[in-house]
């Protein structure tokens, strides 16, 4: 399966940015999700090799980092709202 990612551009952080921004608090998407799994993404890891202990641990770590990223984005949005500053992730 071919990867649609252009490797001349910096890749997303294990897909967390593209997935996390779509799921997070209704803010804009920084990077579109890929049609096919890429090297270095959780989906790419899961589909490119049989699941073993190392792969399972990597996928769990990716999920944990994705959860942390979403919480940080929510916290940032909350603090910006409290300070009445514009959300840097909004499309406006």
From Swiss-Prot:
Location of region: Disordered: 25-53
Name used for this protein in its record: Uncharacterized protein TP_0676
Annotated source species: Treponema pallidum (strain Nichols)
The organism's taxonomic lineage, starting at the top: Bacteria, Pseudomonadati, Spirochaetota, Spirochaetia, Spirochaetales
